[in-house]
């Protein structure tokens, strides 16, 4: 079990305009998380691993010199994440293994602004992979299934996404006594903002 807490308070620089470099902007950050991991080797062939994490972050921004109706800009943001992960590894032979992993997370974000969307994102990622290794050659293949469901209390959300992305990698060691390798790979990536 691991726990972490971080807190900071700092001024932010502003653009220098006509030799005026004064800035009253300020940013406060707080971040805390708790995580745990568990690993169990049932045999030389079977290995199970799981982890869990809770993360909380807070950010407060203040610019007292802004020219608006309130005479300042002041925003607070809160974010939480709940994350679970599990994987199983199966070694069929000494140089051939397969794995199945899955990650799930829930992310929420809130702010003190009147028209803030208050988004919530549910993410589920599952990968199946295989790996072959010998002294001259390594081959890795995998497929990642990504399922994202997003909702917002106000306005539009980024929507729901489903994607299957492949990965293939081949590594060759052409010389026995030299640590020189040639690697080829193909990867299709999918990311959300």
Describe the residue ranges of each PLM region.
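Flexible loop and strand-edge segments within Gram-negative outer membrane beta-barrel domains
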Residues: 2-49, 54-80
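Membrane-embedded beta-strand positions in outer-membrane beta-barrel channels/transporters
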Residues: 31-37, 51-53, 81-89, 123-129, ...
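Generic structural signal for short, flexible, solvent-exposed coil/loop and linker residues
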Residues: 17, 21-23, 31, 35-37, ...
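Outer membrane beta-barrel translocator domains of Type V secretion systems
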Residues: 76-102
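Structural signature of Gram-negative outer-membrane beta-barrels, strongest in the C-terminal barrel
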Residues: 3-4, 93-193
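Residues embedded in well-ordered secondary-structure elements
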Residues: 25-27, 39-41, 75-77, 89, ...
């Amino acid at each position: 079990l691991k726990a972490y807490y971080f807190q900071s308070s700092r001024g932010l620089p502003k653009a220098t305009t006509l030799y005026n470099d004064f800035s009253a902007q300020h940013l406060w950050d707080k971040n805390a998380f708790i995580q745990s991991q568990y690993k169990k080797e049932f045999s030389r062939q079977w290995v199970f691993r799981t982890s869990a994490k809770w993360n909380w972050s807070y950010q407060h921004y203040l610019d007292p010199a802004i020219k608006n109706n309130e005479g300042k800009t002041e925003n607070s943001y809160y974010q939480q994440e709940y994350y679970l992960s599990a994987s199983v590894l199966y070694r069929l032979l000494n140089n051939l293994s397969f794995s199945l992993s899955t990650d799930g997370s829930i992310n929420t974000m809130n702010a003190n602004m009147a028209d803030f969307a208050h988004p919530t994102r549910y993410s589920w990622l599952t990968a199946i992979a295989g790996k072959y290794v010998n002294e001259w050659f390594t081959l890795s293949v995998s497929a990642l299934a990504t399922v994202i469901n997003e909702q917002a209390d106000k306005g539009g959300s980024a929507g729901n996404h489903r994607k299957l992305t492949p990965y293939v990698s081949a590594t060759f060691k052409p010389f026995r006594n030299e640590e020189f390798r040639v690697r080829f790979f193909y990867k299709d990536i999918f990311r959300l903002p």
